[in-house]
């Protein structure tokens, strides 16, 4: 019996989701610094994040660290068909999976620091929305700074940057340091309530009004 093809949006069956979680787990064991979590982000978290922005009117959306695509699919479902989605992912297995499952997305195997280069390649001066699933607290301080500077350089005055963190680590030194980096780079930051139905519970930082020039770190 032939299997029916996946929908264009990339929606998957329950068995496919289980397989996705298994792949994600083994990717974490192989590269914990770049994968950052034992399980992929949930559709519940994706919906909570995407409800905060207007993807339908966005012309260019960027996803940093899409992993296995838990948020990528919902992004494409909400975007206009003429919109551009750029995704930056270091894990090569995830890159190959994303390219197969979401052919509409432009998926690049490169570090998030290189985002401005890929925007220029597509003749885009700035992104309307940048969504991050990166494991910030697993990164050295210098890498966090480089990525955030690349994000700011890829935004305009109306752009939005969103990233999530797990609630149980928000008061740890690494998470508090990252929050300080955000405050130095954005004039407006909102933090959502805890999304308890995600595993583990998470919250979202919504950042606007990018501060273009950062005069060093204290």
Question: Model regions: which residues?
Answer:
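Conserved SAM-binding motif I beta-strand of class I
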Residues: 84-89
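S-adenosyl-L-methionine
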Residues: 95-124
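Conserved class I S-adenosyl-L-methionine
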Residues: 57-67
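Conserved SAM-binding loop of SAM-dependent methyltransferases across substrates and taxa
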Residues: 68-80
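A short glycine-rich, Lys/Arg-flanked "PGG" loop and its adjoining helix->strand segment in the class I
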Residues: 145-157
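Conserved beta-strand signature within the Rossmann-like core of class I S-adenosyl-L-methionine
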Residues: 155-165
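Class I SAM-dependent methyltransferase Rossmann-like catalytic core
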Residues: 21-56
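Class I S-adenosyl-L-methionine
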Residues: 176-218
């Amino acid at each position: 019996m032939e299997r029916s093809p996946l929908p264009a949006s990339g929606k998957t069956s329950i068995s496919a989701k289980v397989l996705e979680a298994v792949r994600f787990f083994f990717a974490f064991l192989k590269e914990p610094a770049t994968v950052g979590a034992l399980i992929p982000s949930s559709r519940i978290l994706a919906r909570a994040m995407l409800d905060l922005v207007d993807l339908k009117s966005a012309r260019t959306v960027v996803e940093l660290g899409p992993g296995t695509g838990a948020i990528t699919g919902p992004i494409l479902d909400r975007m206009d068909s003429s919109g551009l989605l750029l995704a930056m992912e270091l894990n090569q297995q995830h890159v190959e999976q994303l390219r197969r499952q979401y052919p509409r997305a432009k998926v690049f195997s490169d570090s998030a620091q290189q985002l401005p280069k890929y925007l220029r390649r597509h003749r885009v001066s700035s992104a309307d929305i940048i969504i991050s699933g990166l494991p910030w607290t697993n990164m050295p301080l210098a890498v966090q700074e480089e990525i955030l500077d690349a994000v700011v350089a890829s935004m305009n005055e109306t752009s939005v940057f969103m990233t999530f963190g797990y609630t149980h680590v928000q008061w740890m030194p690494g998470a508090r340091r990252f929050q300080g980096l955000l405050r130095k780079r954005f004039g407006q930051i909102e933090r959502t309530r805890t999304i308890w139905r995600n595993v583990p519970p998470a919250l979202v930082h919504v950042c606007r009004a990018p501060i273009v020039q950062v005069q060093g770190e204290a």
